[in-house]
Amino acid sequence: RKHKNLKPFQCDKCSYSCVNKSMLNSHRKFHSSVYQYRCADCDYATKYCHSFKL
């Protein structure tokens, strides 16, 4: 798929498309209002685990 530029997984909220479902699931967090990663010491919260560092 990558070499043929096929992107069968399409976001239903924007024009984003990708080659696999896991990338689409990760992208869907962008549209979500849920911040599941929260700091225990302050008010910081994020949608993505890679943005959360101690």
Swiss-Prot record:
<keyword id="KW-0863">Zinc-finger</keyword>
<feature type="zinc finger region" description="C2H2-type 1">
    <location>
        <begin position="1"/>
        <end position="3"/>
    </location>
</feature>
<dbReference type="GO" id="GO:0008270">
    <property type="term" value="F:zinc ion binding"/>
</dbReference>
<dbReference type="GO" id="GO:0035282">
    <property type="term" value="P:segmentation"/>
</dbReference>
<keyword id="KW-0677">Repeat</keyword>
<dbReference type="InterPro" id="IPR036236">
    <property type="entry name" value="Znf_C2H2_sf"/>
</dbReference>
<keyword id="KW-0862">Zinc</keyword>
<feature type="zinc finger region" description="C2H2-type 2">
    <location>
        <begin position="9"/>
        <end position="31"/>
    </location>
</feature>
<comment type="function">
    <text>Gap class segmentation protein that controls development of head structures.</text>
</comment>
<comment type="similarity">
    <text>Belongs to the hunchback C2H2-type zinc-finger protein family.</text>
</comment>
<dbReference type="GO" id="GO:0003677">
    <property type="term" value="F:DNA binding"/>
</dbReference>
<protein>
    <recommendedName>
        <fullName>Protein hunchback</fullName>
    </recommendedName>
</protein>
<dbReference type="InterPro" id="IPR013087">
    <property type="entry name" value="Znf_C2H2_type"/>
</dbReference>
<keyword id="KW-0479">Metal-binding</keyword>
<keyword id="KW-0238">DNA-binding</keyword>
<keyword id="KW-0302">Gap protein</keyword>
<dbReference type="GO" id="GO:0005634">
    <property type="term" value="C:nucleus"/>
</dbReference>
<feature type="zinc finger region" description="C2H2-type 3">
    <location>
        <begin position="37"/>
        <end position="54"/>
    </location>
</feature>
<keyword id="KW-0217">Developmental protein</keyword>
<keyword id="KW-0539">Nucleus</keyword>
